[in-house]
Amino acid sequence: MDLATDLAALLARWRIDGADMLPPSEPARVEAVFAQLGQPATPEVLTLYTTLGGMATMDNEFWRMWSLDEIAQANQGPPSEWGVLFSDFLIHSHVFRLRTTADGHSEVIADALPGAAAPVRVAATLAEFFALYRQNADQVLTPR
């Protein structure tokens, strides 16, 4: 799994599909936002946000990656043990978090809205998340 390759392929697909893509961020800005939220910007997070700055609109799968400004806004207050909110599916039917692992990766956690099921890990790394997303988005967007 190569995150940069999967992101490049998805970016091309999202542009063709008409998703409103935001410009990439500078590495220092990515590091600053994640540090402010009490979590390091892993190399995967840096690759993600220096390739794609987020989405202004959902893609054809009804998933939307948030901008760094939205991440900072959504993660105000005490840090969650489940990680940093970074995207949503189906207009917030559930949200996704990035949590740094002991080996320096960012695992992806699906977190339902309050009152719903407990959070579920959908991918051990961001590279795995986007590889699965590229093959069949439902694998990661609708965890069971």
Where are these regions (language model features)?
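Compact, glycine/acidic-enriched structural inserts
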Residues: A112-N136
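A surface-exposed partner-binding patch
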Residues: M1-A102, V140-T142
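A ubiquitous, low-specificity "background" feature that marks scattered single residues
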Residues: H94, A117, R134, L141-R144
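Intrinsically disordered, low-complexity regulatory segments enriched in Ser/Thr/Pro
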Residues: G104-L113
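N-terminal non-cleavable signal-anchor helices
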Residues: F96, I109, R121-A123, L141
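A short, sequence-level motif marking secondary-structure junctions
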Residues: T100-G104, L126-E128
